[in-house]
Each structure stands twice: as C-alpha cells, then as structure tokens.
A protein has these predicted regions:
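Glycine-rich, proline-tolerant flexible connector loops at the mouths of alpha/beta enzymes
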Residues: 6-14, 25-51, 79-87, 152-161
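Alpha-helix-loop-beta-strand connector modules within alpha/beta enzyme cores
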Residues: 39-60, 93-105, 168-179, 263-268
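Intrinsically disordered, low-complexity proline-rich regions
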Residues: 280-289, 293-294
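Catalytic alpha/beta core domains of metabolic enzymes, predominantly
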Residues: 110, 118-274, 299
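N-terminal amphipathic alpha-helix/helix-capping segment at the start of soluble metabolic enzymes
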Residues: 1-6, 99, 265, 275
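Hydrophobic or amphipathic alpha-helical targeting/insertion segments
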Residues: 65-106
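Active-site mouth loops of central-metabolism enzymes
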Residues: 1-16, 35-37, 54-62, 83, ...
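Conserved, mostly hydrophobic/aromatic
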Residues: 3, 59, 107, 154, ...
Length: 353
C-alpha cells in the first residue's frame, strides 16, 4: 500500500521540485506526482527523476505530447484522462509509448471535471454523481484497453465522504484494476485530514484500494504524514513511534501539550533517520524487504487518574504531578523528573530500549 503526494512548486524549477520531493521521501512518501503542463516541464521532470529516490508520476492534461515527452524523460507512471488528450490517434500514441516502456497509466477522473453529458445526467437526476464518476472512469479505461493497453490504475474522486465511499464501492464491483484512493479538493489541514481519514480509512478497512493520496490545501509533507498515519492506524504500514497522551483537564498542572509534542517530534525524527538508513542499506543490496523497526510505546499523561494505568501498558511513561512527572520504564517507577527535563528523559529512555 503506497502513499502518494503531489508537488505544488513551479514545475519548471527543477531544484525546488527535487527539494520538495526529497523532503516528502524522507517522511516516508512512496510516490511523488509532478504536473507537466508543457514540454519544458517534461524536461524538468527528467532532471528531477535523475535525482529522485522514489518513483515519479507525470500528471498530464490536454496535450498528449507532454505525455510522450514525460515518458522519454523517465517518468515512472502517467496520470491522465484519455478523453481529454485529443482523438484516438493521440490516445493510441500514448498507449503504445507507455506499453513499450512498461509504464503504467492512472486514469484519474474527478467530480469537478465530468464530461458534459454525464454532468447533465447528474443535474437531471438520471445518474447519481458516483454513478457518473464510475462511468467516466470506465469509459476512459476502455479507450486504453481498445489500444491493447492493460497496465491501468483507476481513481474517481469526489469532494465529500459519502460520494467517495459510494463511488469506490461501485468501482470495486465494476473493475479489477488497482484503485487509487482519495478525497479530491478535501480542504485545509483540519477538515481535509478528517474527510480523507474517514473516507480512505473506511474503504481500506473494507479491503478496497491499492494506493492513497491525502489531498490537502497545505504542504505535501503534511499529506504524507496524514496518509502514513491512516495506514499505520489500520495496521497496513509498519508502526512508527506510538505516543499516547491524554486530552488534559483541570487536574493537569504541567504543560502537557508542549511536552507531548516535543516527545512525538523527537521520536518521529529518529524514526525518519532509521528509515533513511534502512533504505540506503536496501539500495546497496539485492534484498528489497523494508526493515521493520519496532519503536517503544510511550505514554505522556497529565495526572494520576489514568496515568498509572497507561504507564503499566507502555514501555516508557510520564505521569504528571504538580510541576513534575513520575517516570515509568516498562511499568516500573524509576523516579521523578522536573517538567523542564521530562521530554528529554522520556526520549532518552525510549531510544535506549
């Protein structure tokens, strides 16, 4: 199960694109998408690909020549709508070139870009939007299959949770093609995270989906973090650092929000460092199995109500008092630590296990 994101810097700036890609890759991103609006951007994609540690998908609209140029530049996959790159000859040219290079094509349709006849059917009530999205996607898949191209991934994204669920359930019944999941135009960080987590999480729990992208009006790094957390929460990705923390209440007499964030950030940085080292080791060998590291479970609790119970189940735990914490290691009390030292101490013990 792969996590994807898409660059949002100038596609003609190779250095900026590569920097953003590497930043996402360091967080655990598996696939990075770049828009290719013109032939010059296709050349830039080639520069970026030569320096990229992960596969790149070229996002194509309207001009089939951009797809051909992206393939020549080394794109690992294409994302396009065969219906908007011209006539059958253009589709045939792209399909032949992709097949010759062994490059898959993702057929991606969105609720906001339905064909006029399908949009009219939705407006008239003769089709639901999910039905129209599925019909659009399958019609585009057929254009490729008619040219003998079978290496296809499909996405059909709506901008709300109920339509996303209905669309992908219909798609899963209608095709055996791998499905790329996501809620399109999901919004800013908070609502977008919630909408994607609910929709993508439900579909994955039902066994639907092969790749995901969490679309946010935010930096792509945040898309990656949310996507990985969705997979981890469902047991579909090796777990990273697990920090349990309470929501605080009037009993809390320590700055728990700050300390929990510091602990989480420090453990996440170490996790990314280990992941980077593991990937470098794998690249130097023929073994492509990702090394799974088990990170300790850490609890950061604000008071004695749930603190001792959480401490018993955690590898390392803090239980807040009045300006200080009790520190537990594998359920045993090892002492008190001042609030100013608490985050550092729990991270130190966690990394030593």
């Amino acid at each position: 199960m792969s996590v994807q994101t898409m660059g949002n810097v100038d596609p003609h700036d190779a250095a900026a694109c590569l920097a953003q890609l590497k930043s996402c890759a360091e967080l655990g991103c598996d696939v990075f998408r770049l828009t290719v609006p013109d032939l010059e951007a296709a050349k830039v994609l080639g520069e970026v690909r030569r320096g990229s540690p992960i596969p790149i998908v070229a996002d194509i609209h309207f001009d089939y020549r951009c797809a051909l140029a992206a393939l020549d530049a080394g794109a690992d996959a294409l994302r396009l709508n065969p219906g908007n790159i011209g006539g059958a000859e253009n589709v045939r040219a792209v399909a032949r070139a992709a097949k010759a290079k062994g490059v898959p094509i993702r057929v991606g349709v969105n609720g906001g870009s339905l064909e006029k006849d399908l949009a009219a059917a939705v407006a008239a009530g003769t089709l639901t939007r999910p039905q129209a999205l599925v019909r659009s996607a399958l019609d585009h898949v057929k254009l490729l299959e008619d040219e003998g191209f079978r290496d296809v991934v499909v996405s059909a994204k709506a901008s709300n949770v109920p339509e996303t669920l209905a669309t992908y359930r219909l798609l899963a019944e209608a095709t055996d093609c791998p499905l790329h999941l996501g809620v399109t135009e999901a919004g800013t960080l908070l609502p977008g995270t919630v909408r994607n987590s609910v929709a993508v999480g439900i579909l994955l729990a039902e066994g639907i989906g092969d790749t995901i992208r969490v679309s946010l009006t935010d930096r792509p790094e945040r898309e990656v973090k949310v996507g990985l957390e969705i997979l981890r929460s469902l047991g579909l990705r090796a777990p990273g650092p697990a920090v349990t923390s309470c929501p605080t209440c009037g009993r809390t007499k320590v700055d728990l929000m700050r300390i929990a964030a510091e602990v989480e950030d420090a453990l996440e940085r170490q996790y990314r460092l280990n992941l980077s080292n593991d990937n470098r080791t794998i690249e130097q060998s023929s073994n492509r199995t990702i090394l799974n590291r088990t990170f300790p479970r850490v609890a950061v609790m604000g008071c004695v109500v749930n603190g001792p119970g959480e401490a018993a189940g955690a590898d390392v735990a803090l239980c807040g008092g009045d300006g200080e914490f009790l520190l537990y290691v594998r359920g045993k009390l090892v002492g008190k630590v001042a609030e100013s030292e608490a985050a550092g101490k729990v991270v130190e013990h966690a990394l030593s296990l």
